[in-house]
């Protein structure tokens, strides 16, 4: 970044590397936040990483990976809770940091729908656990967490104990025959203070914040734990709504909120109808000033276009609705002193500077360190050791050094000189032409080896269940593990010699390593190797093309370069990795240990050719012969891309019963409309589907015939 915060032009390899780093960071911190309920960084820090990745993907679409955190909501299913699919996906929200970004959102809406009525419903953005409650004929049926948006966790047993969750809806008001209510499970500030006071009194662990307390309580296997906690459910919207006569009663977001309140749900009293975007801005300013006086924690407001037909017309992106946005409050800032800058060494040898700060409270959280990314950022921000600096938690979560305060310098400050040697092993550090990062040149550097092993077991690698960073650090530091292959040679006795390692945990580790050895896919194994410039998408391409490691290792530069998504630099990096003697020795160890996965059937270039191949398709209305998810799977197997909304780019609309406004809009745009039977027939007209893909495809057709 330059001094004005504008992005500095970067070469393709550097950009791809940074995008891979961001994906890995976001997956890791998303796991800590959504699955473990033990975040290591603030929401603002996470938002900053997320926004950087969004920007890079917009500027460099050639490096976008299908598994990017920007295409998904985030979260995973925990062992012990039953997974359950949402009938309609629970999307995340795009963020606007300030009024200007909200105005840009409004401009996008107007471009998509020039005659759109710009009336909004505005709610406080509550900081809790997103939840869906399902009612049938007015009776509570089940409760499901948001999870990854498509699949959540069944927490019916704990949500039954939440005091303001009604088991039966108000009998004096007509209720839908099926109603999916969406909202947040929260703990108020006063209840949170009382809860922690009780925890302290009985010597229990104190909760970090109300959100963690709420999330941890809901996901207990023992419902009595949740029953003892001061949980509340606050509704903000709906999923699927089915009325007995098939006619919709609610036409606006305002109707929904009023209807939910009449049925007996708690809704935020601060919600309001805004007749124009200017009123949304006023509500944002007002709630920002009053946020600390509210009974519960909020980090912004959510603005939704009020008209439900307009919401349907605008549709969704891969991760968020186009008709709603979260306006985040300004970051909390504080002054502190930059004591030192230390260097962290990553798995590829990248040396990342980290600011060591005098501890300071920012937005209720003590901050003592913050990443500085690279040497250029230190220079751009004009930082000197000993400087008074401004630190902020953007979006109230992630710490960032904003700038130095040069007017407070005393003359005792010192210029920071980026080290020319690795601080861990003492080897020379180099900075490649066109790169921002300095790297340790010693691939046997203890820090590099440790980070490589951490990556190998991580979600971005083999995703070995239960084996986290701290355990790997302990294994490496104790000398039990020197390379990733050592993980598959380790014994129970080796593990039992470690601090805080019991019999059960040691057995779980051995079982996890054994499962990884026998069940890992070729794509995951390639990712786990940590080949420079090879991320999830490139690994998928390589696995599909070569089918096994032996063939991949024999591939020459020309063959690699001919593949989709792989250019000269990436091909060269792959060849260099397999030409390295130490890497080949490690790979031979993996082979001897039985960790040598193969694809069941190399995909090659054989893909379905059907009348739907290459088409953009959308489903609307109720399907009779299959579920919506089965229809989507069939379309994708037939080579089509499934869209989320009607636009001029759409090729085909499949209309089931009661298709609604999407059918009218599709016809007005001249889009081809198919019945469900016509869709199945066209999806079945496959000319070329090979190997396992053919079996899968045929089975999907049998299910609906």
Swiss-Prot record:
State the Gene Ontology terms under molecular function. DNA binding; DNA ligase (NAD+) activity; metal ion binding
Q: Where in the numbering of this chain does the BRCT domain appear?
A: 607-696
Do you know which Pfam families this protein is assigned to?
BRCT (PF00533), DNA_ligase_aden (PF01653), DNA_ligase_OB (PF03120), DNA_ligase_ZBD (PF03119), HHH_2 (PF12826), HHH_5 (PF14520), Nlig-Ia (PF22745)
Task: Quote the record's binding site residues for NAD(+).
Answer: 43-47, 92-93, 123, 146, 184, 304, 328
Cofactor(s) required for function per UniProt = Mg(2+); Mn(2+)
Which domain of life, per UniProt?
A: Bacteria
- Give the GO biological process terms: DNA repair; DNA replication
Q: Which InterPro entries does the UniProt record give?
A: BRCT_dom, BRCT_dom_sf, DisA/LigA_HHH, DNA_ligase, DNA_ligase_AS, DNA_ligase_CS, DNAligase_adenylation, DNAligase_N
Q: Quote the cellular component terms of the Gene Ontology held in the record.
A: cytosol
Which chemical reaction does it catalyze? NAD(+) + (deoxyribonucleotide)n-3'-hydroxyl + 5'-phospho-(deoxyribonucleotide)m = (deoxyribonucleotide)n+m + AMP + beta-nicotinamide D-nucleotide
Keyword field contains Ligase = yes
In terms of CDD domains, this protein maps to: BRCT_DNA_ligase_like, LIGANc
Q: Where is this region: Disordered?
A: 684-705
- Swiss-Prot/TrEMBL keywords: DNA damage, DNA repair, DNA replication, Ligase, Magnesium, Manganese, Metal-binding, NAD, Zinc
Q: Where is the active site?
A: 125 (n6-amp-lysine intermediate)
**What Enzyme Commission number(s) does the record list for this chain?**
6.5.1.2
Relate the protein's function as given in its record: DNA ligase that catalyzes the formation of phosphodiester linkages between 5'-phosphoryl and 3'-hydroxyl groups in double-stranded DNA using NAD as a coenzyme and as the energy source for the reaction. It is essential for DNA replication and repair of damaged DNA.
Q: Which family does it belong to?
A: Belongs to the NAD-dependent DNA ligase family. LigA subfamily.
- The name of this protein is DNA ligase
What gene is it encoded by? ligA
């Amino acid at each position: 970044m330059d001094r004005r915060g504008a992005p500095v032009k970067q070469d393709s390899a550097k950009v791809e590397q940074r995008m891979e780093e961001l994906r890995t960071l976001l997956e890791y911190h998303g796991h800590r936040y959504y699955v473990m309920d033990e975040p290591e960084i603030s929401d603002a820090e996470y938002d900053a990483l997320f926004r950087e990745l969004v920007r890079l993907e917009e500027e460099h679409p050639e490096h976008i990976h299908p598994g990017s955190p920007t295409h998904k909501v985030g979260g995973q299913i925990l062992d012990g809770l039953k997974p359950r699919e949402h009938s309609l996906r629970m999307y995340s929200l795009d963020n606007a940091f300030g009024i200007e970004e909200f105005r840009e959102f409004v401009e996008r809406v107007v471009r998509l729908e020039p005659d759109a009525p710009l009336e909004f419903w505005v709610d406080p953005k509550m900081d809790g656990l997103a939840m869906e409650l399902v009612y049938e004929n007015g009776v509570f049926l089940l409760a499901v967490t948001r999870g990854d948006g498509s699949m959540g966790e069944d927490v019916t047993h704990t949500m039954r104990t939440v005091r303001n969750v009604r088991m039966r809806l108000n009998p004096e008001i007509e209720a839908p025959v099926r109603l999916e209510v969406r909202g947040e499970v929260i703990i108020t500030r006063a209840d949170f203070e009382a809860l922690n006071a009780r925890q302290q009194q009985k010597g229990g662990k104190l909760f970090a914040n109300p959100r963690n307390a709420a999330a941890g309580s809901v996901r207990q296997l023992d419902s009595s734990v949740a029953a003892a906690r001061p949980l509340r459910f606050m509704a903000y919207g709906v999923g699927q709504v089915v009325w007995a006569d098939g006619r919709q009663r609610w036409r606006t977001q305002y109707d929904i909120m009023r209807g939910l309140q009449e049925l007996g749900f708690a809704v935020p009293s601060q919600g309001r109808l805004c007749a124009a975007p200017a009123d949304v801005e006023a509500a944002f300013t007002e709630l920002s000033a009053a946020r600390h006086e509210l009974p519960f924690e909020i980090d912004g407001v959510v603005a939704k276009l009020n008209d439900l037909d307009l919401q349907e017309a605008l549709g969704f992106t891969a991760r968020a609705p186009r008709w709603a946005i979260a306006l985040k409050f300004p970051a909390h800032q504080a002054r502190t002193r930059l004591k030192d800058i230390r260097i962290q060494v990553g798995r590829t040898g990248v040396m990342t500077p980290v600011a060591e700060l005098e501890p300071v409270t920012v937005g209720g959280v003590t901050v003592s360190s913050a990443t500085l990314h690279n040497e250029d950022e230190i220079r751009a921000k004009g930082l000197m050791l000993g400087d008074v600096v401004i630190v902020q938690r953007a979006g109230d979560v992630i710490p960032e050094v904003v700038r130095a305060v040069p007017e407070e310098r005393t003359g005792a400050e010192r210029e920071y000189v980026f080290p020319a040697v690795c601080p861990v092993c003492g080897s020379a550090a180099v900075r490649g032409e066109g790169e921002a990062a300095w790297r340790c040149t010693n691939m046997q550097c203890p820090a590099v080896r440790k980070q490589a092993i951490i990556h190998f077991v991580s979600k971005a690698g083999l995703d070995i269940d239960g084996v986290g960073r701290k355990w790997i650090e302990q294994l490496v530091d104790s000398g039990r593990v020197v390379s990733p292959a050592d993980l598959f040679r380790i014994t129970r006795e080796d593990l039992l010699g470690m601090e805080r390692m019991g019999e059960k945990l040691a057995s779980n580790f051995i079982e996890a390593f054994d499962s990884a050895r026998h069940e890992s896919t070729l794509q995951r194994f390639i990712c786990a190797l940590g080949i420079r410039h090879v991320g999830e998408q490139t690994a998928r391409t390589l696995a599909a093309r070569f089918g096994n490691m032996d063939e991949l290792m024999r591939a020459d530069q020309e063959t690699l370069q001919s593949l989709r998504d792989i250019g000269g630099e990436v091909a060269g990096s792959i060849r260099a990795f397999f030409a390295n003697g130490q890497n080949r020795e490690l790979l031979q160890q993996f082979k001897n240990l039985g960790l040598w996965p193969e694809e069941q059937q190399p995909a090659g270039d054989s893909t379905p050719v059907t009348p739907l191949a290459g088409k953009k398709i959308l489903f609307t209305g109720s399907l009779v012969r299959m579920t919506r998810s089965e229809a989507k799977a069939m379309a994708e197997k037939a080579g089509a891309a499934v869209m989320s909304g009607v636009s001029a780019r759409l090729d085909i609309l499949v209309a089931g019963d009661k298709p609604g406004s999407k059918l009218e809009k599709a016809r007005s745009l001249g889009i081809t409309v198919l019945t469900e039977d016509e869709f199945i027939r066209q999806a079945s007209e496959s000319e070329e589907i090979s190997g396992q893909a053919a079996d899968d495809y045929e089975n999907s057709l049998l299910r609906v015939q």
